[in-house]
Curated annotation (Swiss-Prot):
Protein's organism: Thermostichus vulcanus
Residues reported in the UniProt entry to bind chlorophyll a': H680
Binding site for [4Fe-4S] cluster: C578, C587
Protein name per the record: Photosystem I P700 chlorophyll a apoprotein A1
UniProt keyword annotations, A-Z: 4Fe-4S, Chlorophyll, Chromophore, Electron transport, Iron, Iron-sulfur, Magnesium, Membrane, Metal-binding, Oxidoreductase, Photosynthesis, Photosystem I, Thylakoid, Transmembrane, Transmembrane helix, Transport
Catalytic reaction equation(s): reduced [plastocyanin] + hnu + oxidized [2Fe-2S]-[ferredoxin] = oxidized [plastocyanin] + reduced [2Fe-2S]-[ferredoxin]
Protein's gene: psaA
Top-rank taxon: Bacteria
Transmembrane stretches, start-end: 72-95, 158-181, 197-221, 297-315, 352-375, 391-417, 439-461, 536-554, 594-615, 669-691, 729-749
Cellular localization per UniProt: Cellular thylakoid membrane
Enzyme class label: oxidoreductase
An example Gene Ontology molecular-function term: electron transfer activity
Binding site for phylloquinone: W697
Membrane topology: Multi-pass membrane protein
Matches recorded under Pfam families: PsaA_PsaB (PF00223)
């Protein structure tokens, strides 16, 4: 028998083009240089809208995939530069305008502030007393808690980090220019997924986690141990001293050998018990700070680093060993999936929209998961008792997640219109999903109807029974009980199971599932969250709104290329208002319109989630703890009986808790009162664009132009009404901005007052 040697795969190498695109300020100075029509300059006011719509739509600049890839790659560096500048500004505020050092000395008594308003015409009122004689705006970003966890002990260190951020921003701007104009990677480099996976897994995630674990062990842990013991920040050695002077570490962790080589030997000889002083497995929260044990999180990051460094050696590049992604995908055939994943490798290496759609859906879901974990297992010291920050972080990560998920659907639909090739996808999973899209969408539609009528029906029933004075006939914990038995079972399971599955852990991962109240400075950090009928009912509203959002977004993707109504939809593009005047009922069917409608339902969905969270935590978790251990919650546990009627939500949540923002004038919170009003205005302004006929505006504009002509002051650029799609875009943007800013003002004025 002869064994044929494996086919030699071409070697992977980094290939670039030298000086592919000249650097020309003259070209950049010309608006619309990337588009032949736009470059001619404006004839009508539509030009400025098209300029914004197409500036970053690289697909429309060129059809060359290599050039598009380079533009995206370069734009990523530009994006990172903006992020570094933004972060630098945050750190600079911490260094220059904050009470960080005072907060560090008394984190339970002093509120974080990093912004001081200049009293130009009386705005000084916004500088509230945050304790310790400092007057400023209370911040809710959680940065103080993050800085303490990192081991930052004074404002000079923040100053240095801010400068470091600007240096990094400059480096990123240079890299963005360099990799487009000087050394631009070839298309094959962008399509080399094995090398990318190896580098991202081992380098970015593996070494990234390892360096963070190293920082936590050598800097964060000793500094936080001293802070927790009550040592003043100014008496704590500087971070580099802990690294360079092993005797400092030996004082704090005497069991450990802090020698340069001898300290690493136990890791490779599996004698891991040597590290048990600072790589712990405590579980639960640190009772001093109310945050996760920093020694647990250091342990976690070290473990994650090991896993990802191993993962970064799994894919085959130049050494003939490891996985090939194309082989994995083509071998992946289920019993009911036909050709399975065949063709997906080509899809994901030639369509960046397809790639982006998956990444956005994943990152959005991850952000929502982060929101849930940040309050249940607060990762930083004194975060749990800073209620305004907890509420802000939850709300922030929920909104971000919602937007990213909708973005995933948007780019999924763009992929379908611009990049999908039916000939390449024969009987694979993508093709099969598209072939039975009617079954998928009609089932989803049925689920939405079921959830909508039943969840809303429970509320309507309860409102009616309460109005009739028949509490015994209501769905409630004291009437007809609808206990969330599965959720309670999961809570119980997670409280008991770790005793068997993680016998070395001192406590379960999260107190939210069960356990004792964790109190810091007389405030509840976390305690078991009791679930009842009210939660069961709201949960089904969540299920309803999520399913409707998914229905709209998925329908947009699955019907982006064609539908029974418009079989040639792909030819009309991703966004079009209607299929011409000759056909009725073809408006709002483009991929873009589904994203537009999906955004409203995403907004509905996330709003209910953050309202539920805000009220539930104030009612059943957050509050004060008396010396005898009794807990007094902010709203005294009113959620269970009030959140079961629509009237309860309107009266006991929205109206009752809006009193702080409505009555904020004349106090340091007055900016929130103004924001509340102003954001309502922006929201209402959006309706003008959403309930509008384009022809009305065009007629109005023409009579105004006529008047200008009469007076011989007619403009050279002809004014035109917004197109239908532009009007919708302006409408949805203001709707979301107004709604989110209203919620922000409502939440913060409330929780800063009572939290």
């Amino acid at each position: 028998m002869t064994i044929s040697p494996p086919e030699r795969e071409p070697k992977v190498r980094v290939v670039v083009d030298n000086d592919p695109v000249p650097t020309s300020f003259e070209k950049w100075a010309k608006p619309g240089h990337f588009d032949r029509t736009l470059a001619r300059g404006p004839q009508t006011t539509t030009w400025i809208w098209n300029l914004h719509a197409l500036a970053h739509d690289f697909d429309t600049h060129t059809s060359d995939l290599e050039d598009i890839s380079r533009k995206i790659f370069s734009a990523h560096f530009g994006h990172l530069a903006v992020v570094f500048i933004w972060l630098s500004g945050m750190y600079f505020h911490g260094a220059k305008f904050s009470n960080y050092e005072a907060w560090l000395a008394d984190p339970t008594g002093i509120k974080p502030s990093a912004q001081v308003v200049w009293p130009i015409v009386g705005q000084g009122i916004l500088n509230g007393d945050v304790g310790g004689g400092f007057h400023g705006i209370q911040i809710t970003s959680g940065l103080f808690q993050l800085w303490r966890a990192s081991g930052i002990t004074n404002e000079f260190q923040l100053y240095c980090t801010a400068i470091g951020g600007l240096v990094m921003a400059g480096l990123m701007l240079f890299a963005g220019w360099f990799h487009y104009h000087k050394r631009a990677p070839k298309l094959e480099w962008f399509q080399n997924v094995e090398s990318m996976l190896n580098h991202h897994l081992a380098g970015l995630l593996g070494l990234g986690s390892l360096s963070w674990a190293g920082h936590q062990i050598h800097v964060s842990l000793p500094i936080n141990k001293l802070l927790d013991a009550g040592v003043a920040a100014k008496d704590i050695p500087l971070p580099h001293e802990f690294i360079l002077n092993p005797s400092l570490m030996a004082e704090l962790y005497p069991k450990v050998d802090w020698g340069f080589f001898s300290g690493v030997i136990p890791f490779f000889t599996f004698n891991w018990a040597a590290y048990s002083d600072f790589l712990t497995f405590n579980g639960g929260l640190n009772p001093v700070t109310g945050g996760l044990w920093l020694s647990d999180t250091a342990h976690h990051h070290l473990a994650i680093a090991v896993l990802f460094i191993i993962a970064g050696h799994m894919y085959r590049t130049n050494w003939g060993i490891g996985h090939s992604l194309k082989e994995i995908l083509e071998a992946h055939k289920g019993p009911f999936t036909g050709a399975g994943h065949k063709g997906l490798y080509e899809v994901l290496t030639t369509s960046w929209h397809a790639q982006l759609a998956i990444n956005l859906a994943m990152m959005g879901s991850l952000s929502i998961i982060v929101a849930q974990h940040m309050y249940a297992m607060p990762p930083y010291p004194y975060l749990a008792t800073d209620y305004p920050t907890q509420l802000s972080l939850f709300t922030h990560h929920m909104w971000i997640g919602g937007f990213l998920v909708v973005g995933g659907a948007a780019h999924g639909a763009i992929f379908m219109v611009r990049d999908y090739d039916p000939a390449m996808n024969q009987n694979n999973v993508l093709d099969r999903v598209l072939r039975h899209r009617d079954a998928i969408i009609s089932h989803l539609n049925w689920v939405c109807i079921f959830l909508g009528f039943h969840s809303f029906g429970l509320y309507v029933h309860n409102d009616t029974m309460r109005a009739f004075g028949r509490p015994q006939d209501m769905f409630s914990d004291t009437g007809i009980q609808l206990q969330p038995v599965f959720a309670q079972w999961v809570q119980n399971l997670h409280t008991l199971a770790p005793g068997g599955t993680a016998p070395n852990a001192a406590a379960t991962a999260s107190v939210a599932f069960g356990g004792d109240v964790v109190a810091v400075g007389g405030k509840v950090a976390m305690m078991p969250i009791v679930l009842g009928t009210a939660d069961f009912m709201v949960h089904h509203i969540h299920a309803f709104t999520i399913h409707v959002t998914v229905l709209i977004l998925l329908k947009g993707v699955l019907f982006a290329r064609s539908s029974r109504l418009i079989p040639d939809k792909a030819n009309l593009g991703f966004r079009f208002p209607c299929d011409g005047p000759g056909r009725g009922g073809t408006c709002q069917v483009s991929g873009w319109d589904h994203v537009f409608l999906g955004l409203f339902w995403m907004y509905n969905c996330i709003s209910v989630v953050i309202f539920h969270f805000s009220w539930k935590m104030q009612s059943d978790v957050w509050g004060t703890v008396a010396p005898d251990g009794t807990v007094s919650h902010i709203t005294g546990g009113n959620f269970a009986q009030s959140a079961i009627t629509i009237n309860g939500w309107l009266r006991d949540f929205l109206w009752a808790q809006a009193s702080q923002v409505i009555g904020s004038y004349g106090s340091a919170l007055s900016a929130y009162g103004l924001l509340f009003l102003g954001a309502h205005f922006i929201w209402a302004f959006s309706l003008m664009f959403l309930f509008s006929g384009r022809g009305y505006w065009q007629e109005l504009i023409e009579s105004i132009v006529w008047a200008h002509n009469k007076l011989k002051v007619a403009p050279a650029i002809q004014p035109r009404a917004l197109s239908i799609i532009q009007g919708r875009a302006v409408g949805v943007a203001h709707y979301l901005l107004g709604g989110i800013a209203t919620t922000w003002a409502f939440f913060l004025a409330r929780i800063i007052s009572v939290g």
